[in-house]
Amino acid sequence: MNFSVRRSSLHYLLGDEKSTFKLSDMCGGVFRRDKMTKKKSYLPDNKPFGTRVKEDWMHNKWKYIMLVPVVIYFIVFSYKPMYGVIIAFKNYRPNKGIMGSEWVGFLHFKNFFQSPDFVRILRNTFSISGLGILFGFPAPILLALLLNEIRNEPFKRVVQTITYLPHFVALVIICGLLKTFCLSDGLFNTIIQAFGGTTTPLLQDSKYFYPILIGSDIWQGIGWGSIIYLAAIAGVDQEQYEAARIDGAGRLAQMWYITLPGIMTTVMVMFVLRMGGILNVGYEKILLLYNPATYEVADVISTYTYRMGLQGAQWSFSTAVGLFNSAVNIVFLLVANKFSKKVSGSGLF
């Protein structure tokens, strides 16, 4: 048969009520749109597994080919190094190798938990990460919402360019500028003095370390982080805005009742990812900014691991600390994912 039919029961499968099917194309569980679209969809069938695999390869082979470099990357740089995690349970000696080193069980974990530094570095890590989530996570969402309300396209592009640029500035340069601005005669103190305040070397005072660190992180990442939310906003149904305007809703009401709910799934996914790395505080900026005066509040798990492992050559101990860090991250990831499912109905898994 080669005559065309229209079936309302199949319309929802293609999302197009004008799609045309051919009965000859439905044999074996396959149906097609008409020749104008040349797109194929599949219905459940009873074909052998080998045949289904072959058909899937024929239709998606280029996707699989493009996926190969990604798989290789994760195998080489993520999964293969996992073999070295075993040294967290051994007294590793380079001359004996991983398998030849003495097994000590949870000794390094016990030493870490009993260390006088444990409470301090854990407190600092949670403080910096918590402040980053509290102030840094909503910042790109707010910027995306504000950019979406700008109707002047040239001005909008200028704002986007200005906010995106800091992401591409080298971290060393940013830290160098911060150190210069925070001097007693630097830019920040000049502004403080202009408003009647007293000057002080800001990076030498521990109470200013967190605001400087978190503020610079927000400044550097707010523009780049807003891109994904702008993309999510672009996917919100425009008919909802038109209906809201007809009902007399203003921009603020549209933002609150249409835009935010429309991007909530994206927000929750990003929140889960952020919570999954709650203890992964970037140590590079901290290493470049902290000093003996701020060491008490700036030392975190990542800098502690760096100091113990690379500077102190305590490879097994630092691996145990890193493994503890990963275990805590997994727990927070699972909790955040469950919370996301309750709030938005979707999660990472």
Report residues per predicted region:
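Targeting/processing segments of secretory and organellar proteins
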Residues: 1-3, 7-8, 28
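N-terminal intrinsically disordered, low-complexity tails enriched in polar/charged
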Residues: 2-5, 15, 40-43
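Intrinsically disordered, low-complexity repeat segments enriched in small/polar residues
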Residues: 5, 21-25, 66
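Acidic/proline-rich low-complexity IDRs
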Residues: 9-13, 20-22, 42, 201-202
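Short, Lys/Arg-enriched N-terminal segments with co-localized hydrophobic residues
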Residues: 12-35
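Short, Lys/Arg-rich, polar N-terminal cytosolic tail immediately upstream
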Residues: 27-56
